[in-house]
């Protein structure tokens, strides 16, 4: 079988199940987040004159961004990349099939990255969101920005200086992670493993950067739910593919590519190998997303969400993804789309029942 290794933040629950891996998962903080700075009554451990301006004894969050003139490995993700590179060398020597998971933290908050990545961008030239307003008739359940409000140095999302700094920090973090991924891929090439290794790059969510006035991920808008997915298969022609895929589709896809039997009746996902072979192919009609009390269905044309209280719908939104990519107009009241909306909501309820079984 495969020798499986985990580095960094692979799952949100950092403690991982030990029996999922061939060896203990590697974390920069071996004990998860670490009690010393997770317990509010121990905040004095890292208090100093500088940090005292930002420390909140209950949340223990400093500023939402940082640009320090340091090496890549001063921050966590640089060390994750170097550990992954070391593992590639070790796995090559072991001469076994392997699955190596490399979990980077950024571009998650706080937006901390070495200064050289901030220097790639001129803050005054960064374009701010063209739609910093809340769409009309958007359900009250659609909110965001709560996470960033918990950081020190935060003033208001309406402040242009904040917007430019936050967006600058996000860009810097993306470039920082891009560089770390590049180091890992370069080592894969150097070791002669690239032509026998499948690479999957994904992010677990999107992020609002001022669109609709939001700065975060906690809602069912497209900026929060659409995430990167890049797959490199040896000898497979590159390109951009359309269609609808979900992260639950990755496992059956890898099984098919590696000729590993798929557990019968145990998977919700569907292989998207046909899309990798022909970008015009489709493998499924819908993607389903759930956040708190909201349920979202996404097709190639529409994104529809409902919020339920018991069996009653207490909030609705529908966006036409072809004519309104930015999701500026909630079409829930559109008479011309009534049948489409009804069908999408039916599919949501069917999926919800399936998941509750």
Question: What is the role of each PLM region?
Answer:
Residues 8, 99-106, 198-203, 230-231, ...:
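Short beta-strand segments
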Residues 78-92, 155-197, 257, 339, ...:
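A long, amphipathic alpha-helix that forms part
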Residues 1-73:
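Catalytic-site neighborhoods of secreted/periplasmic enzymes
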Residues 28-39, 43-46, 205-211, 217, ...:
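C-terminal cap/loop subdomain of S1 sulfatases and analogous C-terminal strand-loop tails that border
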Residues 110-116, 186-236, 243-246:
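Histidine-centered active-site microenvironments of extracellular/periplasmic hydrolases
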Residues 14-39, 75-135, 189-198, 339, ...:
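Active-site regions of oxyanion-processing enzymes, predominantly non-cytosolic
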Residues 73-74, 137-139, 167-175, 193, ...:
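A short beta-strand-to-alpha-helix junction
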Residues 148-165, 173, 312-314, 323-326, ...:
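Long, internal low-complexity/basic segments
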């Amino acid at each position: 079988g495969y020798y499986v290794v985990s580095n960094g933040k692979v799952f949100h629950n950092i403690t991982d199940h030990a029996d999922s891996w061939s060896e203990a998962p590697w974390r920069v903080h071996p004990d998860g987040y670490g009690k010393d700075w997770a317990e509010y009554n121990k905040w004095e451990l890292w208090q100093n004159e500088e940090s005292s301006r930002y420390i909140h004894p209950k949340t223990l969050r400093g500023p939402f961004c940082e640009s320090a003139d340091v090496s890549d490995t001063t921050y966590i993700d640089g060390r994750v990349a170097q550990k992954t590179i070391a593992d590639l060398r070790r796995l090559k020597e072991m001469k076994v099939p392997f699955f190596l998971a490399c979990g980077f933290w950024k571009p998650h908050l706080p937006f901390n990255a070495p200064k050289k990545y901030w220097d790639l961008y001129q803050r005054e030239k960064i374009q701010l969101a063209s739609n910093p307003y809340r769409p009309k008739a958007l359900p009250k359940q659609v909110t965001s920005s709560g996470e960033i409000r918990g950081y020190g140095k935060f003033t208001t999302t309406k402040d242009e200086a904040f917007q430019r700094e936050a967006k600058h920090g996000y860009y810097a973090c993306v470039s920082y992670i891009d560089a770390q991924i590049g180091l890992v891929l370069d080592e894969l090439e150097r070791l002669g493993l690239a032509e026998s290794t499948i690479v999957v790059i994904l992010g677990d969510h999107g992020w609002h950067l001022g669109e609709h006035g939001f700065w975060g991920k906690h809602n069912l808008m497209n900026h929060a739910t659409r995430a990167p997915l890049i797959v490199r298969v040896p000898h497979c022609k590159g390109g951009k593919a359309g269609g609808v895929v979900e992260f639950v589709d990755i496992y059956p896809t890898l099984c098919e590519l590696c000729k590993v039997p798929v557990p019968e009746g145990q998977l919700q996902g569907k292989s998207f190998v046909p899309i990798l072979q022909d970008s015009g192919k489709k493998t499924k009609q819908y993607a389903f997303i759930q956040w708190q009390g909201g349920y979202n269905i996404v097709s190639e044309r529409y994104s529809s969400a409902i919020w339920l209280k018991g069996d009653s719908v207490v909030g609705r939104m529908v966006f036409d993804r072809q004519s309104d990519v930015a999701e500026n107009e909630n079409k829930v009241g559109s008479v011309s789309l009534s049948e489409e909306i009804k069908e999408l909501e039916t599919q949501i309820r069917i999926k919800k029942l399936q998941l509750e079984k």
